[in-house]
Structures are given as structure tokens and as C-alpha cells.
Amino acid sequence: MEGRFLRAGDTAGLRAEATRAGAEGAAAVFVSESALGDPIVLAAGLAPLVPRVLLGARIAWDREGRHPALLARDVTGLDLVCGGRSVLCFAPPFTEPLAEAISLCRALWLPGEAVHEGPHFPVQAAANRARPAGERIPQIALDLTARDELPSFLVGAADLLLWPLAEAPAACRLESV
């Protein structure tokens, strides 16, 4: 499967790139953080244009960024808008707290209250009131297009790995894990 990184500098360009990627058979499109705004919101806006394509929000996450509980809530909104096609994609740098953040996101996408005892993001009785759209929770992807291998502390943390395609720098190979 192939994915595409959307890189346009304006929303009209993002829409055009997404539509072209869908028409060319891309399985997923990924919107990154940029001056255009939040990638989760931008990905949600593309949902009606590419009804059979996974919609990814690509985030270079660090501890000073969005708390995993807020990230889980925001991606739930994307998942509801796109009918269960959301992908939360993490870009480097990969740090050990990221594995815990992923675990907390997954816990908050499941029914009931989440209790998380981790050293970085302890949470007691947290609930994500809205539920993801489909039978399954949003997928987690790790962008390895600039790396040679997956860090050991993230083995098993993702559903998808994104690998580079040498012939197409704005594209990636999607590997299900």
C-alpha cells in the first residue's frame, strides 16, 4: 500500500493533492503540522473528497505539545468526521514518553474510564465521552521515512509503519504490523 504526504501551502492545494492521491489509488494521505493549522482539523476537512482513503494527521510529538488525552479526544473527532478512517501518525523525534502517550491514547479510545499509571502521563478515571466511529479504534502510524529502523521501545506500539519510497519523496510505503 502507498501513502502520500500532502505538502501544499494552502487549503486549495491540499484539496487538490488529496483528490489526486485518491484518484491515483493511494491508500492514505497524511497532513502534517504547518502554518496552515492543525493537521487533525485539516485532515477532517479532506474527508468528503477522498471517501475511500485513510486520513492521517502527522504530528512531531513531544512532551511540551498536546497532552495524549487531548490528542485522543481530537483524533476521535477526526474519526467521527471521516467514518472510521483516521490515522494518528507520529513523526520523529521518537522518545520513550511517546510509547506511553500511544498507550494512553489507545486506552481513551476504548469504552469506560481509563486509568494510566505511567511515569509521564498518570491519569485517573479519564473518559473520552465520544467514541470512535467504527468497530475498531483509530490506527497509530510511525513515520520512519527518515530513519533506518524502529526504536526498540516502540516495537508493537503502532498499527502501521511508513517507509520511504526512493522514487517519490512525497510518498511512503505503508506496512501493517
Language model regions located:
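Active-site-adjacent structural elements that line small-molecule/cofactor binding pockets in enzymes
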Residues: 1-177
